[in-house]
Amino acid sequence: MLTRRTFLKEMAAGAAFFGMAATAPAQTPAARPNIIFIMADDIGYGDLCCYGAQKVKTPNLDRIAREGVRCTDAHATASVCSPTRYSLLTGTYAWRNRDGDHILSGVAPLSIPHGAATLPSLLKQAGYATGMVGKWHLGLGTKESPVDYNGVIAPGPCDVGFDHAFYFAATGDRVPCVFIENDHVVGLDPNDPIRVRYDAPFGDEPTGDQIPDRLKIKADKSHSQAVVNGISRIGYMSGGRSARWVDEDMADTFTK
């Protein structure tokens, strides 16, 4: 019977095995293949040219499909942000854990249980160096010790198997709008601490529904709270101005 733990181990060990098999005839030292898994929100089966799309050109992803494996049959029990990431990293149905079966806020605790076997932790056991870049959205801190963006941020990605992480906590449209490297906010001025919550605004900080004419993007009802970089977000945030990202520069930041 293929259990969750067996599945994750076979994924980790299998990648190393195929790397060794490719070099065995030449009697050279075993080499492990690099593994890059790209998860992109809001991209459907018909959005890539390699699957027949025409409106938006996707040459880099088309090349990956051409040089790798292109799947044509996939299923998802929860096709939204946090549950998808939870299942990918743990090999577990997200609905088996009430902390991982819904879209999380930027102040939610880590949804992956302490000590759980994860794909990156098993890859590390197989000799890989592991890292993640981009959207995290699996929670930070614990219920007993909520995340403090002004101090050490833990537990987080580096506590579930990643050697290095450069990421943002929730989503691009949710606060806090700052980058985190491993366990600290990047570029934070300690004299301008970050405050984050989702139930009420901070003092006289403007919200999107209050200043609609000053926004870069028209706000809808759900995106009408904190304003960062001229864009109205979900949730409320104050402080951390030196650490706030610029949306237009985000792609360049992640690819440096």
Regions found by a protein language model. Name each.
Residues 2-256:
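Formylglycine-dependent sulfatase
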